[in-house]
Each structure stands twice: as C-alpha cells, then as structure tokens.
C-alpha cells in the first residue's frame, strides 16, 4: 500500500518516513503475515484475517490524511483486504487499485485461467487453488460476494491494469461493474537495465561458455508449475543436440541436465542486468502471467524474448524483440530459438523508451490529479 500526498510540482512526496527505510511504514512482521496466511488456509476467507495489522494501517491513513491511496499487491496476508477496501470507500478517500493479479475481482484466484465464473458469479468453485482452498470448505463465493458489495457505488475508485489483457477481464467482471478501468503498463529503471556487453563477456567466460554457443536464460523467483519450469526442462532436453547453453536464475533447485546450469538467487539488479546482457534469448515458460517484468528488463538490455502467448505476455514483446508462441508448445519455442536474430538497436531504443519507469510515474501522476481536482 502506497500512501502519498498530492504534489504540485510534478513529483510525488511521501509524508511518512521511518529511519530504517524512507517512504515505508511496516504494519506487521513476516511471521505475523505467515500466521495469518495459515489461518486463512484453515477456515477463513482468502486475505480476510490480519485484524491487528489492518487497524494499524487504517490508523496510519487517519494520521497521514492522504489525498490518494494507491493499493498494490494486497495478497501478502498483511492486511484484511475487505476491511481496508470498505474503510476507504466509507471514508471517501480517492483510491487507485492496480491489478497485478486477478484476485481483486474473483473469489480469491490470482489467475482464473480458463474459468469464467468471475464474469457472472464465483460460485461452486472447483479450482481450489492455494488462495481459495481451506480445511473447512471453499470460501470463494463468500469472498466474491464481499468484494462485489464493497465495489458497488464506489465512485472514488479507479482500477488500473498493468496489461490490456487484465484490464479487459476486470472491466468484464461482474464484481467491478460500473468501476472505470484503465491501463498503465509497469515500468523499469532503464538506468540499471541497459546493454552491458563487456560485463556480459566476462560472465560468459566465468561460466565456461564457448564462443559461438547461444545462451538461453530462464529467470523466475521460484521454479514453480505456474512459471513453467517443467516446460523449460523439456525445452532444454529437446535441445540437447543443439549448440545451446541453458541458464536458470532465481531458485536454488538443482538439475543434472548437461546443457543446463542453475545459478540460484541473483543478488542485485545490476547482476541481473549483466545476466540478461549475457543471454542471447530470454525464454518465458509461464502458464499464466499478467505482465512479466523480466520481459521488460531483458528487452531493455537488448535481449529478445520468446514466451508463451498467455495473459499479457504478448504485450511485453515489442516488434523486433522476440516472439510469442502458442501456449505450452515447446516444439515451437525450440524452432524459434534456432532462428531468432539479435534485435536492431532501434528496437532496443524503442523498448527502453516504452518501459521507462518515469513514463509509468507520469501516467500515475496524471491519474492522481484527475482524481483530486
């Protein structure tokens, strides 16, 4: 949750700071959040616990008296989603809700996939994903009912999708009926993510990558089913006869494929920028995704992207900077890897301008001003 005052000079100023980290107010500990997540799994609503932390957060909002409250990533079990939204509506505080996932308009699913229940009513849910499953029965319908009741008649709420894909789904959902939905793509720091050929060459040497061998990178915070790590392994196996070296970054999972090296967690954005620059292609094997940041970062570093055409992934691949292939089609992905050409400098420059975080900030500032005349 980001709490800002309105700026009159073209920038944003936060009126609350802590000594540990500027612009940040911690309302609960990681241990508290994990405990609340466990409570939800036992028998409660998804994101419907955290009473103490929510009271503390609402107290900070009362203290700061913001012109706008901007909500992002509320599924971390650090606040009661329903109580916070109801408070902001009742207090008539202009509120921006950015959609990084679908749970704000479903019965709790981060990604509804092929389910269309959210279009009419989330009821009789059989998906029982990690967000909605609990020991005492599925509470997806109760979650959807609460959200729909809160959104109804909320005329000071603006919903923003990071991608056109999620914005279309949100606008079509019955829970958000009548709420304006716009699109502001995420941005990245192009002062960090830029082509680094010299550092990339040194990294390739340190990994004993032979000259002329193409490097295929997979990057994800966790090697999960949703991120498609199993499909990435299938891809690496199918390319065993080709002059390709596969790298996987972000998780400590080890595998014994001879053409695959797992790098574990990469500490620091600069190190990631070097890794992107060292790769010839970034592959995105996600089964579901909204607007993956790794695609923006790789493009800004001059590395083309090959990903499955799911969610907002095609929107992150600009002309000349990669290809989106049919979902789950590892064979199509392998064929593209063998023929994809390096991007032209003009295409990289276009990506850097398009994904610059300053563009995103200006778009949000314009929205804040429209909401606070």
Where are each of the predicted segments found?
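Short, small-residue-biased leader/transition segments that mark boundaries at the very start
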Residues: 1-4, 8-16
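Conserved donor-binding/catalytic core segment of Leloir-type glycosyltransferases
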Residues: 160, 210-227, 233-236
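Carbohydrate-associated surface elements
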Residues: 165, 187
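Short alpha-helical donor nucleotide-sugar binding micro-motif in glycosyltransferases
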Residues: 274-279
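Aromatic "clamp/platform" in nucleotide-sugar-dependent glycosyltransferases that forms part
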Residues: 287
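Short hydrophobic beta-strand element within catalytic cores of glycosyltransferases
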Residues: 304-307
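Conserved acidic donor-binding segment of nucleotide-sugar-dependent glycosyltransferases
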Residues: 319-330, 338-342
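A charged, aromatic-enriched C-terminal amphipathic alpha-helix characteristic of glycosyltransferases
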Residues: 342-372
């Amino acid at each position: 949750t980001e709490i800002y005052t309105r700026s009159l000079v073209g920038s944003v100023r936060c009126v609350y700071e802590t000594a540990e980290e500027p612009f940040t107010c911690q309302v609960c500990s990681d241990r508290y959040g994990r405990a609340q997540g466990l409570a939800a799994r036992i028998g409660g609503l998804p994101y419907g616990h955290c009473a103490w932390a929510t009271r503390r957060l609402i107290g900070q909002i009362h203290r700061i008296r913001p012109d706008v409250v901007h909500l992002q990533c509320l599924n971390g079990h650090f606040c009661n989603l329903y109580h916070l939204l109801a408070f902001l509506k009742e207090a008539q505080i202009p509120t921006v809700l950015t959609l990084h996932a679908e749970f704000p308009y479903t019965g709790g699913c981060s990604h509804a996939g092929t389910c269309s229940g959210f279009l009419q009513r989330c009821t009789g849910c059989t998906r029982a994903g990690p967000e909605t499953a609990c020991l005492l029965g599925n509470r997806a319908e109760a979650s959807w009912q609460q959200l729909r009741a809160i959104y109804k008649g909320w005329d000071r709420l603006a919903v923003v999708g990071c991608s056109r894909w999620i914005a279309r789904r949100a606008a079509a959902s019955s829970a958000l009926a009548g709420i304006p939905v716009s699109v502001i793509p995420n941005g990245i720091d192009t002062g960090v993510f830029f082509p680094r050929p010299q550092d990339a060459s040194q990294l390739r040497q340190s990994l004993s990558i032979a000259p002329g061998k193409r490097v295929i990178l997979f990057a994800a915070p966790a090697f999960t089913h949703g991120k498609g790590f199993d499909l990435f392994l299938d891809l690496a196996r199918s390319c065993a006869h080709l002059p390709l070296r596969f790298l996987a970054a972000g998780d400590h999972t080890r595998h014994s494929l001879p053409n695959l090296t797992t790098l574990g967690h990469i500490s620091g954005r600069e190190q990631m920028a070097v890794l992107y620059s060292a790769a010839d292609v970034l592959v995105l094997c996600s089964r579901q995704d909204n607007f993956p940041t790794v695609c923006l970062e790789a493009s800004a570093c001059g590395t083309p992207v090959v990903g499955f055409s799911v969610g907002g992934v095609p929107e992150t691949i600009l002309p000349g900077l990669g290809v989106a292939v049919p979902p789950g089609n590892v064979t199509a992905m392998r064929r593209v890897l063998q023929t994809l050409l390096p991007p032209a400098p003009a295409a990289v420059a276009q990506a850097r301008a398009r994904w610059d975080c300053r563009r995103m900030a200006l778009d949000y500032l314009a929205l804040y001003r429209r909401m606070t005349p």
